[in-house]
Amino acid sequence: MRIPRTNHMTEQEGVIKFQLDFSPAPALPASDLLEIGAWRKMLYLTQLIGQTPERYDGYGFGNISRRLPPFDAPRHQRRFVISGTQTGNLAELRPEHYAVVLAYYPARNLIAGEGPIRPSSESLTHGMVYDMDATAQWVMHAHSPHIWCAARSFGIPM
């Protein structure tokens, strides 16, 4: 597997907090993104993904990913497509708004990815979820003040 080595960066403004080895690459075909696009739109319409000046200092919030084959890949190399960084303000994502994470190394705080956009700031978290359960196919990271405020009444441990 090729791991790109073109662009080391850590953004300091509060979004990306990992080292990123990123290579610009063409977008995945639109036909490969129909299902992730439909789920992402549902999360956007229910305000679980979005961007508003009132929340998180105006940064976008929430993201979505889906595992890519091969599904028997070893830990830290379970590829996935993920929404690009700071795309929360967009009602619908086009292929150029998704990145592919090729590998992730938590001990080194490093993501290797490619695509037309840099991957979400939560890419390392998504990778760890896929490592915790090799059968996991999706990660949907949503933000809901309503659920958070009502967590105790729902029996959600805090």
Cite the ranges covered by each PLM segment.
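Glycine-rich flexible loops
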Residues: R2-M158
